[in-house]
Amino acid sequence: MMVIRPVERSDVSALMQLASKTGGGLTSLPANEATLSARIERAIKTWQGELPKSEQGYVFVLEDSETGTVAGICAIEVAVGLNDPWHNYRVGTLVHASKELNVYNALPTLFLSNDHTGSSELCTLFLDPDWRKEGNGYLLSKSRFMFMAAFRDKFNDKVVAEMRGVIDEHGYSPFWQSLGKRFFSMDFSRADFLCGTGQKAFIAELMPKHPIYTHFLSQEAQDVIGQVHPQTAPARAVLEKEGFRYRNYIDIFDGGPTLECDIDRVRAIRKSRLVEVAEGQPAQGDFPACLVANENYHHFRVVLARTDPATERLILTAAQLDALKCHAGERVRLVRLCAVEKTA
């Protein structure tokens, strides 16, 4: 059974294995053991209440409960940009016009921005390619909404998610090659590694401070602005169906889109509810997959179960209850895994 749980110190080697499979561009999951260990420690201290809000971040893993295999990772930053500035570009417009010459040009322009400062961030989503089946990707991504719904006071009103931009298998980023490299004088992979290992001072020191006309970039770079890596397209679709939208903010490195949503408008958060759980044999039928989570802050768990999402009394097997670390008579959080598709 696949289970979402908080990260543990013993997971570092498994996270290193996952990091080696990302193919680059996932800044928050570098293949650096010291950095990953520090990330785990920060998550543990967050759960223990030992960190200020500016440093808090939760990390979860997807585990096969039968074998102990860690198949994926996901995380939430509580409030970005309160310690180090959180940069992105806003894609806007500058108009150059002359009535005398009968010239009017509206030019797409990149403006350096810190507009998302203080927002909660969904980040570090990666599922081992060997485990991309049977709803694991949906479980991994959406489990975070169950945690946010249960512990709403821990998070801010706006949630953002940076999507990985277009990068090829050799680590080549058209956006970086045409823009970032001119200011940073290093390859994308080097800048990505420095950022991922916490060495972010160079961003503020070297970033261009003035607006940049996108027409000055290569056509290849212009074409990838706001576009996602092919492997990230499913993750983007998942978030958009939960209510997230692209509002013309992009990553300063690879040009990937930043999606955002008010936390209380996220479908899985808004529609999740608490129901009593009982032990037994679940009813047979053509039921949809649902997310089921306990309400235990320190021992949070999420699993998938096929059931009626409108039920008031959820029947789970002994194995499912054990995976959730809860008992009959307790209350669990329930929501349909995917939104019901509207038909004409």
UniProtKB/Swiss-Prot annotation:
InterPro entries, sorted: Acyl_CoA_acyltransferase (IPR016181), Arg_succinylTrfase_AstA/AruG (IPR007041), Arginine_N-succinylTrfase (IPR017650)
Biological processes, Gene Ontology terms: arginine catabolic process to glutamate; arginine catabolic process to succinate
Biological or metabolic pathway of the protein: Amino-acid degradation; L-arginine degradation via AST pathway; L-glutamate and succinate from L-arginine: step 1/5
Cited Pfam families: AstA
UniProt-annotated catalytic positions: 229
GO molecular function, one term: arginine N-succinyltransferase activity
Reaction it catalyzes: succinyl-CoA + L-arginine = N(2)-succinyl-L-arginine + CoA + H(+)
Disulfide bonds: none
Keywords annotated in UniProt: Acyltransferase, Arginine metabolism, Transferase
E.C. designation(s): 2.3.1.109
Enzyme class of the recorded protein, top EC level: transferase
ATP-binding listed as a keyword: no
Binding site for succinyl-CoA: 125
Database matches in HAMAP family: AstA
PANTHER family reported in the protein's UniProt record: ARGININE N-SUCCINYLTRANSFERASE, N-SUCCINYLARGININE DIHYDROLASE
Its job: Catalyzes the transfer of succinyl-CoA to arginine to produce N(2)-succinylarginine.
Similarity comment: Belongs to the arginine N-succinyltransferase family.
NCBIfam families, per the entry: arg_catab_AOST (TIGR03243), arg_catab_AstA (TIGR03244), PRK10456.1 (NF007770)
Name of the featured protein: Arginine N-succinyltransferase
Organism: Shigella boydii serotype 18 (strain CDC 3083-94 / BS512)
